[in-house]
Amino acid sequence: MKKLLTTLFALLMTTAGTQAQVSFGHAEKINKGWSFLRVDSAWNVSERPAMKEKAFDDTRWRKVDLPHDWGVELPMSPDKGSCQGYLPGGVAWYRLHIPVGKLTEGRRHYIYFEGVYNYSEVYLNGHLLGKRPSGFASFLYDMTPYLEKDDNVVAVRVNHAQEFDSRWYTGSGIYRNVWLVSAPEVHLAQWGTAYRLTAINKSKATVEVDVETSGEGRVKSEELKIKNEKLSATVELIDKDGKVVATAKTTIGSSEKKTVKLTVKNPQRWTLERPYLYMLRTVLNAAKAEDNDTSVVRAGLRTLDFSPNKGFALNGEWMKVKGVCVHDDAGVLGVAVPKEVWRRRLAELKDIGVNAIRLSHNPHAPELYDLCDEMGLLVMDEASDEWEFPKRKWMKGWNAGKPEFQGTYTYFEEWIDRDVADMVRRDRCHPCVFLWSIGNEVDYPNDPYSHPVLNGDGTGFTQPAYGGYKPEQPNAERIGIIAQRLAKIVKDIDPSRPTTGALAGVVMSNATAYPSAVDVVGYNYTESRYGIDHKTYPERIIYGSENRHDLPAWKAVTDNEHIFGQFLWTGIDYLGESGQWPARGSSAGLLDLAGWRKPLGWYRAALLSTKPVCYIGTYRNVSRPGRNGNNRRNQRPNINAPGRWNWEKGDSVNVVCITNGKDARLLLNGKEVGGKPGHDESTGALMWSVAYEPGTLRCETDNGAAYELTTTGKPYALKVTTDSVAHVFVEVVDEGGNTVTTADNEVTLMVRGARLLGMEHGNIADATITGRQQRNRLRTHGGRLVAYIQPEEGTTMFTVRASSPFLEGGTLTINR
């Protein structure tokens, strides 16, 4: 019996994960077999109004599967904006033919898009279903009024002609999943199920569950009215063994919201170490069983407490939030990122010691929230980066040259209320979400808002003033007014979590209603205000919403009980916000674009991890002119030093040790060298200067950690490995099997039984990596690369063969 219940629970978990954010009816992905055409005058491909019509001939269009980001299929160009990673946008159409067999007579049919960038227009058989300018919003359209008895055609126009509308790479296209949903005439509302933990102890928990139905305006016949009178809803909470641990029932109308109460005995809490997930199943019971509707969502029971003096507590335990910010992309994949790629990235961040993710600066793909629920990571969900005025979008490098001012501000007033509400309704069932952010750096001084306080008060402050108060600029008081409006929208939907905002101009915002409009106030790069503002505003809850990687920024958290945490900029390198050409993105992450840990990631692990940590990197010790013309050696350790032990014999080499131990010793070919290491107070790193000899360099710390570097020979062969069906790793190795970290050999991949989505090496400065013609060929960086693989449907095995001139190739066969 227990096995049967466990199987049932696994099925429910799969259903919840598969259907993602579709919380009613029967949902089916329709990602396969779309026709795609990018319309571009430069390519002599013109747009025609008939492209939305059912009868339009799209047989010559390219076939693509979703999710799809056309931006990374095209070459980078210095003529494009550095803000978007020198990648193009444009206008494109997608079309999908839905056979009549996929539709069920007598039911309503919907189409649900998790995300389309941007300015989407969706048509069914030539009829406009709706428009959504936001490229980050998820949205649902009712197809029923325009369905025909034969095949039906969905056409989607995507307009990213304003290519410079974001400060980072957004991608272009239908870059998230699309779902076809079938439901009875009266059904549970999309995102209509929500729960709140109202009380919990070891023996009992009380959970309130909202149930909402949709059917208003459709219940017209007497038969349907009779059905409506007999509607009821049953709510069940199911544990991991498949056992129903709490249940409640209520009558409900065809377009009504009801709240029921569940009592759970011996509740299991959702924690970061043990993220226990129940299943919350809601059944809308109609007069006939075939008219029933079901919603299944995951549920985690946890408490959140915030204090201006003690910080933040999860489940009553006060803790520090060790967060990072992340953007949507994954390098060569653009923003069409498979779930397993995110799983690997999040697992690496968690291994470093990260316990929270700030989803910058927009709602992300639903699968990412599912992973954070499963893996035990807190999430700060963020609505937008821009309000009623545009920010600077840099064209020739970060903060360089003349900016553009395209942006999402063009539809702010019309859509922001809906976009914020939809974010909260969509994501409120995720236990990982602990903060709702209404905006990022909307208060940057004179970009565009200004205030007399920018003239200074004689005491000085750290925020850039850009020439002081500019009365011709928009009045900063507007920020507080908008913040009050957006915070109210959030709290009306979900009073169980606090609102926040990430403030860039704290001093200026303190002169407005913005900080008081939100429950928790985020400070971007303003550690110097932590103590001052804690005294000035003793009821304010403060944390670092965006921070540098340096040790003083982290000590500002650990040394101040009232500061509950920080979010590093960033957790992972990302496309866009690039430096000068040919940089395709920002290298501010703990992980590179390929998802590999950088030395900076090891440095953060030494600060955050509870496990023993040791890493060594090396660089040549060169003389540099000091003050008064004297020469001096490199005294401050470079914490970004690469892990390599290939130098010239006799070179003086600096060896940097990053560790959470207090002391370490260095061994070269088994003999201790370097003596007692120097300790750098500014970074906490240890360092030796030693004479280079080939062989094995090993560091051992006093807390039991160790790290080795080995001198490698010439490139000899390719080593091909995998950690899952999503990733295949290719390394250039010498005859001893050691990775040659200096190798940049070109690798060609041949894949059978699967689709090669792309190859990534993590090199932020490589402008040749984009473009479809480059998809199966790439030079290694640091002697390695990762290939992203998507198995074909129905296949149980696929093969990857790697080759490179003058090297022995490698072949890997993977069984699913």
What are the residue ranges of the model-derived segments?
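Short flexible loop/turn segments that cap and initiate beta-strands
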Residues: 56, 227-234, 273-278, 652, ...
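Bacterial Sec-dependent N-terminal signal peptides
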Residues: 1-23
